[in-house]
Amino acid sequence: MPGIYHMTKHLILSLLRPTPFKAGVVCILAACLLWYSFGYEKPDFFSAIDARIVDTMFRVRGVEKTTDSVVIVDIDERSLQEYGQWPWPRNIVAELTQKIYDAGPLVLGFDILFAEKDRTSPADLFNRYRSVLSGCNNIDTLLAAMKENPELNHDRLLGEAIASGTSVLGYMFLFREDFLKSSGVSPFPSLNISLDAKDADFSDLRMLRAYRPIINIPEIATASSEGFFNVFPDQNGTVLKVPLFIMLDNIPYPSLDVEMFRLVRGDQEARLHLSKIGDKRSRALIGVSIGNTFIRTDDLGHLTLNFRGPYNTFPYLSAADVLNGSGVSI
């Protein structure tokens, strides 16, 4: 009996003695337990820790030089001082658009939404003061002729300028029900989307789902394609990830970034790659292929940003300099 007791005690002490292998086993078991407890949803506490770790890694790495293939035309304070408060009359935006096209960019992206008509258009301006002009002869004929004159319709001027080059117009999605959704109102990207799984449908995708879009007015919606520019900051206001696609009525719509990248590459299709693990009624993404380029995403189709650096890391041009032709090149 003493021998058995001694062996049992020795075995217990041996099992309790810490070793790197045992520590690894404990960590793996703890991680599995946490994953089983929380599933795909990461608690806010752990998400906050992840975000801070990522921030620290970018600060330690420092600024990375850009390729100068992306140039940002900024409607900055100097532009507002010179051309007036925003929003500008759209004949000025049309002139800015044309001057950017003249510089020869591969694609022009607008992270601006033109959801209402330009109230400064002369044709609309005179129409609002119809009562003042009521004493004039043939006022209705005059106003109709003014409305058809493209030089007096700023929205048509901007639409024609946008259509003269390769561009992507931005729009936004709303996610809360506001009872303003209209049937038949949807964006019109020129992208073809396919799935790499034959047994899946768009309705199966695990993505953000929008309630309705806020799109550009028809006179201006003349771009080569359209893409949303919604962003979703974390609790500290930092944007760590961006969605490449958002679902609307069980159809995935691409972001402004995806469409600009695709048009630069000259591709017509994006292929969504689905995970073979998990519930087939809620398929997670693993990435997106555009041409020969594979872009890895999280399960919701979000891309983790690789920050190049702080503000002004990419080349910025003042819109005022572009409009004035002050020796700037794009």
Outline where the language-model segments fall.
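Extracytoplasmic
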Residues: 237, 250-256, 266, 298-300, ...
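Short, Lys/Arg-enriched N-terminal segments with co-localized hydrophobic residues
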Residues: 1-6
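Non-transmembrane functional regions of envelope-associated proteins
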Residues: 8-298
